[in-house]
């Protein structure tokens, strides 16, 4: 073994297997790009993003950890969200929940 060497298993790795997902259509109504990270509570994203926030409550982007999705001004796109796991307690972000979901 070489320090830092990666030895991935054969086949494909399915992210968030068996977790609840929803799709939402999101429009950036602002005049600047907005980037949302993989573990940000989507319900609490920038107010310039127009979408059904109640559907997104308790969900985050269904993308690989450490990555993000960028919404350009005027852009509309559909994204898949995955349910937050664990204790489902949310603190921080934009302070809209600050407790159990």
Curated annotation (Swiss-Prot):
For this entry, list what GO says about its biological process: urea catabolic process
Say where the protein is mainly found. cytoplasm
A GO molecular function annotation here is:
urease activity
Subcellular location per UniProt equals: Cytoplasm
What keywords are annotated for this sequence in UniProt?
Cytoplasm, Hydrolase
* Pfam families the record matches: Urease_beta
**Gene Ontology CC terms, in alphabetical order:** urease complex
Q: Which SUPFAM superfamilies match?
A: Urease, beta-subunit
Q: Which pathway does this polypeptide act in?
A: Nitrogen metabolism; urea degradation; CO(2) and NH(3) from urea (urease route): step 1/1
Q: What class of enzyme is it?
A: hydrolase
Q: Which reaction does it catalyse?
A: urea + 2 H2O + H(+) = hydrogencarbonate + 2 NH4(+)
Q: Coiled-coil segments, which residues?
A: none
EC identifiers of the protein:
3.5.1.5
Q: List the disulfide bonds.
A: none
The record's family statement is: Belongs to the urease beta subunit family.
Subunit (UniProt): Heterotrimer of UreA (gamma), UreB (beta) and UreC (alpha) subunits. Three heterotrimers associate to form the active enzyme.
UniProt protein name: Urease subunit beta
Gene name for this UniProt entry: ureB
